[in-house]
Amino acid sequence: MTILVTGGAGYIGSHTCIELLSAGHDIVVVDNLCNSSKKAIDAVKKVSGKDFPFYVCDILDRDALSSVFDKHKIDAVIHFAGLKAVGESVEKPLEYYHNNMTGTFTLLDVMRSHGVFSIVFSSSATVYGSPKTVPIKEDFPLSTTNPYGTTKLMLERVLTDVQFADKRFSVVLLRYFNPIGAHKSGTLGEDPKGIPNNLLPYVAQVAVGRLEKVHVFGDKYPTKDGTGVRDYIHVVDLALGHVKAVEKKAGNPGVYIYNLGTGHGYSVIEIIKAFSKACGKELPYVIDPPRAGDIAV
């Protein structure tokens, strides 16, 4: 298959590109590079030993996106492109709703006009809000605690409605937890612009001296040590999940929903202690107030 990967220069997107190429698929990548870098694309080409088309393209730009579809016979789309920081979404809700929602509307419109009806959507476990029990199953009640999560939940509904109206569509909704890790080659990993939003790259930057200490947001949650607990899944496992989803469901009309995680959570303090042990030195941290939109588990 030839698969369009939106947001393919991002952390999860770039690792998925490698696994798609390894599985024998052709890829076309678009990314506006607002929170990623072309270095990731170069790394994918180096690791895979394969070349592929890459376009600096914003999915909000219908003409530019349509031009990509005109140039390539796309069989399916894996859709990562979007703004993704929980805290920032609370501060900039309008930007998140506009970018994530309108961008996906534009993508779906262009897909339909070019006869492409298979999409794997990068959703999130944030659509479950603050669950009463864990581990979380796909049939749990849905709710959100921040604008980022709300965009994911709303887009799940949009995609479901689109498939209900047009039975040619195959929609896979992948609700995943917290990706961590890097490609075994060491040439590709999570490399955020500016201060990291995710825990692992933040801890890593403290370990190498780029940042002074880890900021732990909240220690009064109803968890084992009072800090937030998250399910961490290796990014390559997550990437392989996307490959399997597009291989199994592309061309099979319907809506398919899958959680992607390990089923086991670790607290922020546990992560810091484990990282400290691995690097052979204690990493300093400070307790800060909880961030708006964060949950315990």
Indicate residue ranges for each PLM-predicted region.
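Glycine-rich "substrate-gating" loop/helix at the edge of Rossmann-like oxidoreductase active sites
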Residues: T145, I180-P196, A204-Q205, K220-V236, ...
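Short acidic-hydrophobic sequence patches enriched in Asp/Glu that either
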Residues: N32, S36, D191-L199
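Aromatic/hydrophobic pocket-lining residues that form π-stacking "cages" and hydrophobic walls in ligand
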Residues: L107, L159, V203, G241, ...
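Short alpha-helical functional segments enriched in proximate histidine and acidic residues
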Residues: E19, A23, V110, V206, ...
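N-terminal Rossmann-like NAD(P)+-binding domain of SDR-like oxidoreductases, especially those catalyzing
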Residues: M1-A182
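Residue-level signal for the nucleotide or nucleotide-sugar donor/cofactor binding architecture
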Residues: L60, E91, N99-T102, N146, ...
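C-terminal substrate-binding subdomain of Rossmann-fold SDR/epimerase-dehydratase oxidoreductases
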Residues: V208-V297
